Regions:
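Oxyanion-hole/transition-state-stabilizing segment in secreted/luminal serine hydrolases
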Residues: 56-59, 63-66, 71, 85-121, ...
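Active-site segments of SGNH/GDSL-like serine hydrolases
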Residues: 107-111, 127-163, 184-187, 194
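N-terminal secretory signal peptides that target proteins for export/translocation
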Residues: 1-10
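Conserved catalytic region of serine esterases and O-acyltransferases that act on ester linkages
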Residues: 38, 200-450
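Serine-esterase "nucleophile elbow" of acetyl-processing enzymes
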Residues: 30-81, 91-100, 257, 347, ...
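Bacterial N-terminal signal peptides
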Residues: 11-24
Length: 450
C-alpha cells in the first residue's frame, strides 16, 4: 500500500478545486433549468383538456410574440381531453416529436390524480427522456387546482386535495432531473379558494337565495380497479367569476394561470416607459422613442414607438387583474406625466378613447396595458384572432394529417400554418401610436374637466 502525504496548503488547494468544480456544476445545472427563447424556437405545449381549451396557452403565446417581436417563434398546441402521462407517451411521435420542437412543456395531473402517484412520476420521467432524445428542452408545469372553494389544508374535493402531493412530487422530480418546473397549483389554490369563499360571504350578507352549484368536474377515466372518488362538497359562488367550470376556467381564470406560469418562467415584465412634463418636454424614454411632443390648446400630444408591445390581455379577462394585481408586473407599459394640476384627463390613442385618469394616476405612472378599449384593444383582438386560427383549425388539420401519416395533407397544413404565422409576425411588429391627453389643467392650470 502506498501512502501519499500532502501538505496543508496542498489539501487546501485541492479543496478549493473541488468546491470550484461543484460550483461550476451547480451553475451549469442552474443554466439548464432556465427557459430562454431564441429565434426559430418551436414550443409544443402538451397537456390535457385544459391545454386543449387553447386559452392560457394562447395567452402565453401572445405574451412572447408581442414581447419579442423580432424573434420568429412557433407555438404548437398538443392538448387532448382526458389525457394522462401515458396518453401523451402513446401519441408522442406523431403529436409532439413530429412538430420538431426545441421546447416541450408538459402540463398534466388533473386526470393523473385518479391513479397512483408512482405511475404519474414514471410517466413524467419517461416523457423527459423522450423530449431530451428529440432533442428538445423539457418544461414541467403542474396542474392547476380545481376551482371548488378549496384552500390549502381545507380542501372541498378529494381531487383538488390530491393534486397537492402530486405537485410536490413533480417539483422534486424536476429538481432531480434538472428540468424547468412551474408550480401553478399552489399560487392559485388560495387565490381561487378565497375568491369562492368571499363570494359565499357576499351572498350571505345579501341574504340571497342563490342555490349552490354542485361540483361537476369533467369526467375522467378511472385507473383499472380504482374506486370512484368521494363526492365533493357544494361549490360556493365566486366573488370574481373565473368563467368556465371548476376544472376548465374561462378567460379570467386562464389569465390567472398564464400569469402564474409566466412568472414561474421568470418572464421579463418590462415593456417600456415614458415620462413627459406638463409643458410637453420628454423627461425620460426607456425602450421607446417619443417624438412630436407638444402642448397646444390644452392638449398634450406625442408619438410613441416602442421596441416591443404590452401583453395583450383580453378585455373579457380584465377582472383577472383585480383578482391578481401582480399580473401587471408582467407588462410594465408605463406613461407618466408630471406637473399636472388636479383634475381628470382624457387619454386617447390614435384618436380613440383609451382611459380617463386623474393627475395623481398619471404622475405615478399609468400602465397602458389596462387600456381595454380603443386602438390597443383593437390590435389585441386582431392578434388573438390569428392565434386562435393558428392553434384552432390549422393546428387540428396538421395534427390529423400527422396521425394519419398523410404527407400531402401534412404539407398543405404546414403551408397554411406558415402563412398564418407570417401574418401574425407582421402584426406584432412595433407601430407608432399617437397619444393625446386633455383636460384638468393642461395649458390652463386650475380649470377642471367638465
Amino acid at each position: 500500500m502506498i501512502t501519499v502525504r500532502r501538505s496543508a496548503s496542498t489539501c487546501l488547494r485541492l479543496l478549493a478545486a473541488v468546491l470550484l468544480l461543484a460550483s461550476d456544476t451547480a451553475a451549469t445545472h442552474a443554466a439548464e433549468a432556465a427557459l430562454h427563447l431564441k429565434d426559430n424556437d418551436v414550443w409544443v405545449m402538451a397537456g390535457d383538456s385544459i391545454t386543449a381549451q387553447r386559452q392560457h396557452t394562447n395567452y402565453i403565446e401572445a405574451y412572447y410574440r408581442t414581447r419579442y417581436p423580432k424573434l420568429r417563434l412557433h407555438f404548437r398546441n398538443s392538448g387532448i381531453g382526458g389525457n394522462r402521462t401515458g396518453s401523451v407517451l402513446a401519441r408522442f411521435e406523431y403529436d409532439v416529436a413530429a412538430w420538431k420542437p426545441t421546447i416541450v412543456s408538459i402540463e398534466l395531473g388533473m386526470n393523473d390524480v385518479n391513479g397512483p402517484e408512482d405511475a404519474y412520476l414514471k410517466g413524467m420521467k419517461d416523457l423527459i427522456a423522450k423530449i431530451r432524445a428529440i432533442p428538445a428542452q423539457p418544461v414541467l408545469i403542474s396542474s392547476s387546482p380545481v376551482d371548488d372553494g378549496s384552500i390549502m389544508g381545507d380542501w372541498r374535493s378529494p381531487r383538488c386535495e390530491k393534486i397537492h402531493p402530486f405537485t410536490e412530487a413533480l417539483k422534486k422530480l424536476a429538481a432531480e432531473e434538472k428540468v424547468v418546473f412551474v408550480d401553478q397549483y399552489h399560487p392559485l389554490i388560495d387565490l381561487w379558494g378565497k375568491n369562492r369563499r368571499k363570494g359565499a360571504e357576499a351572498v350571505a350578507k345579501k341574504a340571497a337565495t342563490q342555490p349552490l352549484v354542485p361540483a361537476t368536474p369533467a369526467p375522467t377515466a378511472l385507473a383499472a380497479g380504482a374506486a370512484a372518488p368521494p363526492k365533493a362538497l357544494p361549490i360556493p359562488p365566486s366573488l370574481i367569476p373565473l368563467g368556465g367550470d371548476p376544472v376548465h376556467p374561462g378567460p379570467v381564470g386562464q389569465t390567472n394561470m398564464a400569469a402564474v406560469i409566466l412568472a414561474g418562467l421568470k418572464a421579463d415584465g418590462e415593456v417600456s416607459s415614458a415620462t413627459l412634463s406638463v409643458e410637453g418636454k420628454v423627461v425620460e424614454a426607456k425602450r421607446c422613442q417619443i417624438t412630436d411632443a407638444s402642448v397646444q390648446g390644452g392638449k398634450l400630444s406625442f408619438t410613441r414607438l416602442d421596441e416591443s408591445g404590452p401583453w395583450p390581455i383580453p378585455a373579457t379577462a380584465k377582472t383577472a387583474i383585480t383578482l391578481l394585481p401582480e399580473t401587471l408586473k408582467l407588462s410594465q407599459y408605463l406613461l407618466r406625466v408630471t406637473g399636472l394640476a388636479d383634475g381628470q384627463y382624457r387619454v386617447s390613442i390614435n384618436g380613440k378613447p383609451a382611459a380617463t385618469l386623474n393627475a395623481r394616476e398619471l404622475a405615478a405612472g399609468w400602465n397602458i396595458t389596462t387600456a381595454f378599449a380603443g386602438a390597443l384593444n383593437d390590435r389585441a383582438v386582431a392578434i388573438a384572432a390569428l392565434i386562435t386560427k393558428l392553434q384552432g383549425p390549422l393546428n387540428t388539420d396538421w395534427r390529423a394529417a400527422s396521425k394519419l401519416k398523410d404527407a400531402e395533407k401534412l404539407a398543405a397544413a404546414q403551408t397554411a400554418i406558415e402563412a398564418c404565422e407570417a401574418e401574425l409576425q407582421a402584426l406584432v411588429q412595433p407601430v407608432a401610436w399617437k397619444f393625446e391627453a386633455e383636460g384638468g389643467g393642461l395649458g390652463y392650470r386650475g380649470r377642471l374637466l367638465a
